[in-house]
Design a protein with these regions (language model features):
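Short S/T/G/P-rich N-terminal loop/turn motif that feeds into the first structured element of a domain
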Residues: 1-68, 73-94
Length: 94
């Protein structure tokens, strides 16, 4: 399944991107993959398409102490994380 989520940022997009790169091995172990991410022009909000086995898996992963700490240190307001919508079908042109 895929979801579209958003989270508020206090340090801009670059630290958030680096955090996701650093956490990629942990995400892969948990079966979670970031498909796409983008920010608003002010870089205080990121929008992310995430692929996972189920929504509970993502919640459990995101609430792990080390993951929440890494997200917070990168400027993500963990409490602001919001699932905008599950994604049914999608199209990504190559």
């Amino acid at each position: 399944m895929k979801i579209l989520a958003t989270v508020n940022l206090s340090k801009g997009f670059t630290p958030w991107v680096q955090m996701t790169k650093d956490l990629t091995p942990e995400m892969e172990k948990a079966g979670i993959k970031i498909v796409w991410a983008g920010t608003n022009p002010e870089e205080n909000k990121v929008f992310v398409v995430i692929e996972m086995q189920n929504a509970e898996q993502m919640k459990t992963f995101g609430e792990r102490e080390n993951i929440a700490k890494a997200r917070a240190e990168a400027g993500a307001d963990v409490a602001s994380t919001t699932v905008i919508s599950p994604i049914g079908e999608d199209y990504i042109p190559v």
